[in-house]
Amino acid sequence: MKLSLAMLALGAFVVAGAVVAVGTPGPTPVEIAGPVVKLKDKSGHGSGVHIGNGYVLTANHVLPGAEKSMAYLRDDGRKGTAKVVWGSAEYDIALMKLDTYDGIAASNLECRAPVMGEAIAMKGNPLILENITTWGRVAGTEISMGPWASVIPVDGAIAGGMSGGGAFDADGDLIGINVGMMIQQLGLGSSSVGISVIVPGSAICGLLAR
């Protein structure tokens, strides 16, 4: 959730010397929505990250099948429509375009793979919650695993609805897209093992350059 800080101008009042110093309020800060959006359709929801000029990165499995657009919700409450530009099932990455992008921050995409032990923050909209951040560290090196051509394991939590959200480094730069978590089958049920996977920025930049 975005925290807006209201700045109050402080003034001093000295009675004995009849000197009054009055602070003049500064301009009201302009509200800028964060870069992570919620993407929704009739079957469910995921997340996406605005990288500039209305373009949003997300996970390919978040896309709505035959439909070419999804509704989106910004963290400032504004809504709109995002259209599919392209998707890669091999890498589980897709690019969408917002119908309007005024007043929304853009993430700086780093074309690199996070390194072992690096601190990482993962943002998205898990389950019934919105604008959630979880923290962890890079737990392994870049690998091909299951349906993903290139992912990096991290020890932070990713839950359903966070797919397509961003993985950010200590400087706030986008270094990956959340795509899944590892599940262990336990009899008739299953349990998360605490390891999630992200597609690294290096692979994403390779797709964008095609």
Predicted regions and their residues:
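Generic detector of low-complexity/intrinsically disordered segments
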Residues: L5-A12, K97-T100, R210
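Protease-domain processing segments flanking chymotrypsin-fold serine proteases, especially trypsin-like
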Residues: K2-S43
